């Protein structure tokens, strides 16, 4: 059996995912814990890895995500783009706790394509992992999409994160679906449904009307009998994601090549965004978000502790 060499931790606001890894980055064991927003990160981390410590000693740990924010363990300043993988690893905050070497990765900041400040924390680790898992991203210009509550669109050139832009798509959908008249109690989103496709098509064909002028159709189509109530959530999702994709792609065609958008996310979000991307005539390549986060942490460990 391989010998344990380090601990990798993907530590978001609501959940901690831990990986006990050998020197080559292969996972030997997994663990979980509370998110970075809960109090006493140091104590909770120690408790989560206590069994590993007993078996292997106090192994070094590399952590990414909201653990480095103002609500986390220790705040790590944002690194300004353009940012290369080595620079991200080099900007990690390093310290020791009870004989354990710890490194927390920074988030990134930039002036986005709208000319305003933007930030990310956690997604940069997934981007590092995407570069490791898909070597062809190391050369040329590429567009990565990292869907979630706050969707990140990142532009990569020769392994360098040049800039990125945040879309509030996930949070907007959750607010409208659960706290408005548009799609309350309307069922789950189905990326294969006619309603989802209808939302995508309207977003594509009437983009110039603006999202605010299209959203109420999720309600009016139901009230007039044109669409079943249980289809409203899928339709609303199609509208929001469709406009999100169109805005990001249309604003940046000169910033990426090959006509492919690389998605880094869960399978469900990949299904939703892939359909939207292909609706605009582009290809979609998918990288699992958890796999990318782990690969990014493994890469960072090699850079920091080598």
PLM-predicted stretches and their roles:
Residues 204-245:
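Adenine-nucleotide phosphate-binding core of ATP-dependent small-molecule kinases
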Residues 275, 285-306:
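Glycine-rich phosphate-binding/hydrolytic loop that grips phosphoryl groups
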Residues 109-204:
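Glycine-rich phosphate-binding loop plus the immediately following alpha-helix
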Residues 27-59, 68-75, 184-185:
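N-terminal phosphate-binding loop and adjacent alpha-helix
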Residues 15, 258-276:
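Glycine-rich phosphate-binding loops at beta-strand->alpha-helix junctions
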